[in-house]
Swiss-Prot record:
Protein name (database record): Tryptophan synthase beta chain
Cofactor: pyridoxal 5'-phosphate
Function, in words: The beta subunit is responsible for the synthesis of L-tryptophan from indole and L-serine.
Signal peptide: none
Domain of life: Bacteria
Gene this protein is translated from: trpB
Pathway assigned in UniProt: Amino-acid biosynthesis; L-tryptophan biosynthesis; L-tryptophan from chorismate: step 5/5
Record's catalysed reaction(s): (1S,2R)-1-C-(indol-3-yl)glycerol 3-phosphate + L-serine = D-glyceraldehyde 3-phosphate + L-tryptophan + H2O
UniProt similarity note: Belongs to the TrpB family.
Quaternary structure, from the entry: Tetramer of two alpha and two beta chains.
Organism name: Blochmanniella floridana
Residues that bear N6-(pyridoxal phosphate)lysine: 87
Gene Ontology annotations for the cellular component aspect, listed alphabetically: cytoplasm
The keyword Lyase belongs to this UniProt entry's keyword annotation: yes
InterPro entries reported in the protein's UniProt record: Trp_synth_b_CS (IPR006653), Trp_synth_beta (IPR006654), Trp_synth_beta/beta-like (IPR023026), TrpB-like_PALP (IPR001926), TrpB-like_PALP_sf (IPR036052)
Amino acid sequence: MTQQLHSYFGEFGGMYVPQILIPALIQLEKEFIEAMKDISFQTTFKNLLHHYAGRPTPLTLCQNLTSGTCSKLYLKREDLLHGGSHKTNQVLGQALLAKRMHKKEIIAETGAGQHGVAVSIASSLLKLKCRIYMGYKDMKRQELNVLRMKLMGTQVIPVHHGSATLKDACNEAIREWSSTYKHTHYMIGTVAGPHPFPTIVKEFQRIIGSETYNQIQTHEKKLPDAVIACIGGGSNAIGIFSGFIDIPSVQLLGVEAGGLGLHTEYHGSSLQCGETGIYFGMKSPILQSQEGQIKNSYSIAAGLDFPSVGPEHAYLKKINRVKYVSINDEEAINAFQELSLYEGIIPALESAHALAHALKIIRKTPKKKQILIVNLSGRGDKDIITVNNALLNKEICK
């Protein structure tokens, strides 16, 4: 068997995995190509998105946040999708692929728990066994999502070594897949990892961009000035960017985790501070030491706490199609509070990074007429305790 799809985005991407996994990845690519041509598969997938997951999701105009400015700020409401985030889109597609390949079990990793919940949902629905690897630190800060996964029959496996976060959970999931690939499907949660995962996940998240393109035309009869999304691995961003990538007049902005500041060791901004290397089965920017060791990333948002990024984002940065910036923890928390207070919408901390940058733009040029769209990739129920603790600690330190 040989590859049929391009496995690189410029110099980034590839299939850097143990030789034993190459046939499994090529089989996955083959099944994906055939599924994309299969009307029955496509119909089943679209029906699940509509009747089960709740698509299309709304494009909501903020009523109060932009008061006193000439800007319009729209939110693409992936937080309203079944499961609470954009993750549900692509796990339904991958679960259908797993069934098509006659796989009986699903393994995956999760950081914020949103991907883990989504995988649990799809596995429960399609009667697949499910095991999720999750860093012990992430399990502690995302206890609600851990309970959700267990309620749906998922075995959640804590990862204690290393930084005990998403990076280490990814390593453990790939390690298990290397010995169980004949009967398991590894369900990567983002547009990272070895080929063909970045392409598959993008295809199943493309619905966000196509819906948003049509909705903004209906609302405004024109295109937005900018589309903004947070970047961890980068699937929600690739999803919404795909609807506008070929329109140069629409600025695309990816927002990384600034953590405690890019001048510190505590951030997750691999596109701005990383060096190209091999990690998680791909060639992409990585936070690494001078000796080539993978550094620990950091973000108050568990889903952005990842030391690398999807290879297509690296390519889009290199060709200057997308501008990548960072938002620190404090700015994200402020945006989290503002959206909750003024619009009655509690965003995921990950999404709050994108919102914070949008508010920066609006407040820097309050008299400018502009239309901005933020991908509200998930809801923030999971983050309320984290934010409350951060605010309490801030008060104590005053």
